From Swiss-Prot:
Keyword set includes Transmembrane helix: no
Stretch list, region Disordered: 1-31, 50-198
GO cellular component: cytoplasm; nucleus
Lineage, highest ranks first: Eukaryota, Metazoa, Chordata, Craniata, Vertebrata
UniProt protein name: PHD finger protein 23A
Biological processes per GO annotation: autophagy; negative regulation of autophagosome assembly; negative regulation of autophagosome maturation; positive regulation of protein ubiquitination
Gene: phf23
The protein's role, per its UniProt record: Acts as a negative regulator of autophagy.
Keyword terms, alphabetized: Autophagy, Cytoplasm, Metal-binding, Nucleus, Zinc, Zinc-finger
Pfam families: PHD (PF00628)
Zinc finger regions, PHD-type: 216-264
Species per Swiss-Prot/TrEMBL record: Xenopus tropicalis (Western clawed frog)
Length: 278
């Protein structure tokens, strides 16, 4: 009785097949070979290496083998028939997320190969070289100015003119109109004896600097002749600059009296006007 009871299986115990099916299959850990297969597939997809004749999905692990297969096998069971090797499946295109990952990997590899692994662009170096050239040109201009000055401080007008020369003209801006020399001389002739009048008169110098009368001082302004146009007084025969006498070159009178002779003459006498309108 004991043998029969021990030999018989209780109806409450589940069969062995149900025990093995109820347990989840164990996941196999990835190996170096799996990683190499994945890399070779990515390189073949990107076109870096030729596609092998037999492709396998590297990221799909082979079917897990249940460890309870040996327990299921029994001496009384019939042996499994030999299975023929299945034909290789055609390569399936990877999912969309896998494609985006592969494309990102390929783009990074191409950018690193083209740029030599450097992320800096050569444009920054070119900009720095241009700035250095500009600074060097400015320094040479300053040295030239110091040489021309010779220890004397330049006037504000000269500094402004140099700044205008250094500053590039804006596109679309027109140059300032320049008046002819005749207009400038006529405009400056009726004014007071200022530096501007002297500069205008200097343009009409008719005598060379080697003449003996170049340094002759006769005018009451105590300035030399220096080749500037002058007029002679009819009384004292003193030569006076036209700018000091306030006479225009286009309206030189035939008779001229200097300031001293004009003041010493009789009050009833009439004197020709030097500043008659043209």
């Amino acid at each position: 009785m004991l043998e029969t009871t021990m030999g018989e299986a209780s109806p409450e115990d589940p069969p062995l097949n149900l025990k093995s099916l109820s347990q989840p299959p164990q996941k196999r850990s990835r190996t170096v070979e799996d990683f190499n297969r994945f890399c070779s597939f990515v390189l073949a997809y990107a076109g870096y290496i030729p596609t092998p004749a037999k492709e396998e999905r590297a990221w799909t692990p082979p079917s897990s083998v249940s460890p309870h297969r040996t327990e299921e096998s029994d001496g009384w069971d019939s042996p499994d028939p030999p299975q023929l090797p299945a034909p290789p499946e055609p390569p399936q295109p990877p999912a969309t997320s896998d494609i985006s990952t592969i494309e990102t990997f390929v783009m990074k590899a191409k950018s690193q190969g083209a740029g030599g692994g450097s992320s800096k662009m050569p444009g920054g170096q070119e900009d720095g070289a241009e700035e250095e050239e500009v600074q060097a040109k400015k320094g040479s201009r300053r040295k030239r100015r110091q040489r021309h000055r010779g220890g004397v401080r330049m006037s504000d007008t000269d500094t402004d003119e140099e700044e205008r020369e250094e500053r590039p003209a804006a596109p679309g801006s027109l140059p300032a109109p320049q008046l002819p020399p005749s207009a400038e001389s006529s405009r400056d002739g009726g004014g007071s004896s200022s530096d501007a009048d002297t500069q205008v008169m200097d343009e009409d110098i008719m005598v060379e600097s080697g003449d003996d009368s170049w340094d002759l001082v006769t005018c009451y302004c105590e300035k030399p002749f220096a080749g500037r146009p002058m007029i002679e007084c009819n009384v004292c025969c003193t030569w006076v600059h036209l700018s000091c006498a306030k006479i225009r070159k286009s309206n030189v009178p035939d008779v001229y009296y200097c300031q001293k002779c004009r003041a010493g003459r009789l009050p009833g006498a009439t004197t020709p006007k030097a500043d008659s309108a043209p």
